[in-house]
Curated annotation (Swiss-Prot):
This is Acetylglutamate kinase. Gene3D superfamilies: Acetylglutamate kinase-like. Keywords: Amino-acid biosynthesis, Arginine biosynthesis, ATP-binding, Cytoplasm, Kinase, Nucleotide-binding, Transferase. GO terms for cellular component: cytoplasm. Belongs to the acetylglutamate kinase family. ArgB subfamily. PANTHER family: N-ACETYLGLUTAMATE SYNTHASE, N-ACETYLGLUTAMATE SYNTHASE, MITOCHONDRIAL. Its EC number is 2.7.2.8. It comes from Gloeobacter violaceus (strain ATCC 29082 / PCC 7421).
Length: 303
């Protein structure tokens, strides 16, 4: 293998091992060729340079072998950094960013500008053809003000998703591009809203009739015991996922991620994955190997 070989093989020592990896990946490449996979990109995999490079190369690898990746990203740490630079208070209520007018301007500047274009450039430098977008472009995502079942203070321009129009994304995929979407959207009057990136990824996956939704996180996946990584649940269905939430096994920040997966599955996405983005080549390991590395959710265990 030449020095220009994809980095996904650099950690593998022997030629025999390399051949084994390719042999194991082949049926998955054949199975998912032409299929759409929506990747929510965030967490440590977005912040740490070594992991960031590997995720980008994984995305380009998937596109190169005929799979159609779509990237949806957040950028919380970068937003916080810029708010602090501008002496704007960083506030959260119930896990949601308090987003007043000036904060919304910073959120849009950072997500749709700096973070989005950085990801696009990295993909292009790695050999892909990425196009940067936000939910406002082509009216991909229409937002509405966030509604909470609990009484809470006004949190400003935090939005829920009213509807998704996938036509622009579909056109880009048809032309061989990798769409990269930031989670900023507008309501019917053109007001910008900050949308949860997990939610945006899940709803977009459903609208695209995607084969897979993959959430890159900073946890191994869904754990029976959150203090023991070896208690990873590798496969579960919608009923089991809801049961784990009701029993309190799934709690805290994992609840909205699991709910996002469940909603995507209920709308026709074939599988949803919660994957540890801190693992090297997490995407390739989850999509192209027999065992995977995270938790896979399906509509029914019969699938």
């Amino acid at each position: 293998m030449s020095q220009d070989a994809p980095s996904c093989f650099t950690a593998i020592i022997s030629p025999a091992d390399r051949v084994q990896v390719l042999a194991e990946a082949l049926p998955y490449i054949q199975r998912f060729a032409g299929k759409t996979i929506v990747v929510k990109y965030g967490g440590a995999a977005m912040v740490k340079e070594n992991l960031r490079d590997l995720v980008i190369r994984d995305i380009v690898f998937l596109a190169t072998v005929g799979i159609k990746p779509v990237v949806v990203h957040g950028g919380g740490p970068e937003i916080n950094s810029w708010l602090e630079r501008l002496n704007i208070p960083v506030q959260f209520v119930g896990g949601l960013r308090v987003t007043d007018k000036i904060t919304m301007e910073v959120v849009e500047m950072v997500l749709a500008g700096k973070v989005n274009k950085s990801i696009v450039q990295m993909i292009n430098q790695a050999g892909g053809s990425a196009v940067g977008l936000c939910g406002r472009d082509g009216s991909i995502i229409e937002a509405r003000p966030h509604q909470s079942a609990q009484l809470q203070p006004d949190i400003g321009f935090v939005g829920d998703i009213q509807s998704v129009n996938p036509k622009l994304i579909q056109s880009l995929l048809k032309e061989g591009h990798i769409p990269v979407l930031s989670s900023v959207a507008s309501d019917e009057n053109g007001q910008a809203y900050n949308i949860n990136a997990d939610t945006a990824a899940g709803e977009l996956a459903a609208a695209l009739d995607a084969e897979k939704l993959i959430l890159l996180t900073d946890t191994p996946g869904i754990l029976l015991d959150k203090d023991h990584p070896r208690s990873l649940i590798r496969k579960l269905d919608i009923y089991q996922a809801r049961k784990l939430i009701a029993e309190g096994v799934v709690d805290g920040g994992m609840i909205p991620k699991v709910q996002c997966c469940v909603r995507a599955l209920a709308q026709g996405v074939r599988a949803a994955h919660i994957v540890d983005g801190r693992q090297m080549h997490a995407l390739l390991l989850e999509v192209l190997t027999d065992q995977g590395i995270g938790s896979m959710l399906v509509a029914s265990e019969l699938v």
